[in-house]
A protein has these predicted regions:
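Transmembrane helical core of 7TM receptor-like proteins
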Residues: 1-357
Length: 357
């Protein structure tokens, strides 16, 4: 029988984060070496590695339970999103603009989960929360990159639904597969801008202790307290970038859905109205889960009376970061008739092949 730790290492290699993005990490090393030696007081020792603490109040007897929870969460998320990608790749009938967005979102969810979760599992399974300095900065960049990417993908999804519902006759001309592919590729590139600026800023700043990160992974708000010296400019720039990449798309999403709701209410066909509204409600649920908790967390620094304990803050961050990645493929598979029909046909085909064998 396979021991739990062996099973964990089979699916979640301890150094998975350290193997991601060698070129990016090399760039971070180069940028870090540009720091002048007078930035750090000689009395300080420069940090070479960080330690992920996770939930600071969690008792050791619950470590294995938490590790198992995140391990099962990770496997389920990756398998569910990979299934969605495979269905799209094998079924030519699904190669439409709407499904191109779904696949892009699925790949983004796989990327974010793979960057964020394995080290958290290692922290509680093998009590190994250490990350090299540049590996931590790389993780910080990728965490915010995939968060920004998801925001842009949700904007693209809202734009697609807006054109499909408000301009149904012009939609096939306005939104072709080539147009949507170019739009999604642009999202994957543009999403690097603000996280890249923040990461380069951190790479040029002095970290001189302590090195414990009170969070589930390396990210801007958890790294800032570890910087020596004044961080107001960097923190202000990071907040400005986060607000822009999150809430500018959200504003356009809200406007597009207001237009969609108006168009739905004008529909003469009651059955078509219900079907269209159901599709939009599904996407609205995903958007709400993604944005509302983020707004709550990012707003706390501006309200001194609104305080969150580290455990609640970490739990809230994990909720809005990881839950959409888990439920997205299941919601779209269960609520999209074309995907349900294809999965049903696969199952029936499997049942027919098995007796023949």
């Amino acid at each position: 029988m396979t021991h739990p730790e062996q099973l964990g290492k089979l699916f979640v290699p301890d150094g998975i984060v350290k193997r991601v993005g060698g070129m990016t990490e090399a760039l971070l090393v180069f940028v870090t070496r540009l720091r002048s030696s007078d930035e750090v007081d000689e009395n300080y020792t420069r940090i070479t590695e960080f330690v992920i603490v996770g939930f600071p109040s969690l008792q050791p007897e619950y470590f294995q339970l938490v590790a198992w929870f995140f391990f099962l969460f990770y496997v389920t998320t990756v398998v569910g999103n990979l299934l969605l990608v495979m269905v799209f790749a094998w079924e030519h009938s699904l190669q439409k603009p709407m499904y191109i967005i779904m696949v892009s979102l699925a790949l983004s969810d796989i990327g974010f989960t793979t960057v964020a979760v394995p080290k958290l599992i290692a922290r509680y399974w093998w009590n190994d929360g250490s990350l090299g300095f540049h590996t931590c900065l790389l993780q910080e960049h990728m965490i915010h990159y995939f968060g920004s990417l998801n925001s842009l993908i949700l904007l693209s999804m809202a734009l697609d639904r807006y054109l499909a519902i408000c301009f149904p006759f012009r939609y096939p001309i306005l939104m072709t597969n080539q147009t949507m592919t170019g739009l999604t590729l642009s999202c994957w590139v543009v999403a690097h801008i603000f996280p890249g600026i923040a990461t380069i800023g951190f790479a040029t700043m002095p970290f001189c202790g302590p090195n414990q990160i009170i969070h589930a992974f390396c990210e801007t708000m958890s790294l800032t307290p570890l910087v020596c010296g004044d961080t107001s400019k960097q923190l202000g720039a990071a907040y400005a970038g986060a607000m822009f990449i999150l809430y500018v798309p959200l504003a356009f999403i809200i406007i597009s859905y207001i237009c969609i709701i108006i168009s739905i209410l004008r529909m003469a066909n009651g059955q078509g109205r219900i079907k269209t509204f159901s599709t939009c409600a599904t996407q609205g649920c995903i958007i709400s889960i993604y944005y509302i908790p983020r707004f709550f967390v990012y707003s706390t620094p501006f309200f001194p009376n609104l305080k969150m304990t580290p455990d609640i803050r970490i739990a809230t961050t994990l909720f809005y970061s990881l839950l959409p990645s888990l439920i997205n493929p299941f919601i779209y598979c269960l609520r999209t008739n074309e995907i349900k029909m294809i999965l049903r046909r696969w199952v029936q085909r499997k049942k027919c092949i098995t007796p023949i064998k």
